[in-house]
């Protein structure tokens, strides 16, 4: 049975420059990843109904740390450093990418990935790399096409269908939905997916503990 979590009770735990500074690697985490201007922080704030839980910046690329938020005991959301922003100094970009890659490859509690991309400019190279990596390690993915309010209904549906078809060859557990923090489009779909991931995995872990 799917448990419904109260995301409005989510609270900030810690910011860390890399995996070594994070909390103990247990429980369940779902990470939010995306280009630096994809609206990641806005999506987290909308999900949790908290205006400043995740810091939003007028300058994309300011989220340089891995940020952890607790939904419930052992259940966490993770805001990963934004990727692909051209105006960030190269040395800093490499540092972020290293921290991002290390988290994705070594964090055992990571059980789901939300990839956010602007609905008007979806599936850039780095977005596809992120999805392919998740598929390779059998991690389920929810793609959120953000800023959906910027398009009329017909154009929005066309983009949604285009991306859904484009990810089919990836052969993974990938769901694609339109999303808008401003108009609250797709927030229910995001909540349902997170509830499903967290509930399924908690049930499996409880069974393993009982053995």
UniProtKB/Swiss-Prot annotation:
Q: Which GO terms describe its cellular component?
A: cytosol
Domain EngB-type G intervals: 26-200
Sites where the protein binds GTP: 34-41, 61-65, 79-82, 146-149, 179-181
Q: Which Gene3D superfamilies match?
A: P-loop containing nucleotide triphosphate hydrolases
Q: Which keywords appear in this protein's UniProt record, sorted alphabetically?
A: Cell cycle, Cell division, GTP-binding, Magnesium, Metal-binding, Nucleotide-binding, Septation
Q: Its function?
A: Necessary for normal cell division and for the maintenance of normal septation.
NCBIfam families documented for this protein: GTPase_YsxC
This one is known as Probable GTP-binding protein EngB
């Amino acid at each position: 049975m799917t448990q419904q979590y109260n995301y409005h009770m989510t609270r900030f735990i810690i910011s860390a420059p890399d995996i070594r500074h994070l909390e103990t690697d247990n429980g369940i985490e779902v990470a939010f990843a995306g280009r630096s201007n994809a609206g990641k922080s806005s999506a987290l704030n909308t999900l949790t109904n908290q205006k400043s839980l995740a810091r939003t910046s007028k300058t994309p690329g300011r989220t340089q740390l891995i940020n952890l938020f607790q939904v419930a005991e052992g259940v966490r959301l993770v805001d990963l450093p934004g990727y692909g922003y051209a105006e960030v100094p190269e040395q800093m970009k490499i540092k972020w990418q290293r921290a991002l890659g290390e988290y994705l490859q070594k964090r055992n509690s990571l059980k789901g990935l939300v990839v956010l991309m602007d609905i008007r400019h979806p599936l850039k190279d780095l977005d596809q790399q992120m999805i392919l990596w998740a598929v390779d390690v059998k991690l389920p993915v929810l793609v959120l096409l953000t800023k959906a309010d910027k398009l009329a209904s017909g154009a929005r549906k066309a983009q949604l269908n285009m991306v859904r078809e484009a990810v089919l060859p990836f052969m993974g557990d990938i769901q694609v939905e339109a999303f808008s923090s401003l108009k609250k489009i797709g927030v229910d779909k995001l909540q349902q997916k997170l509830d499903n991931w967290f509930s399924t995995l908690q049930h499996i872990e409880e069974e393993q503990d009982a053995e």
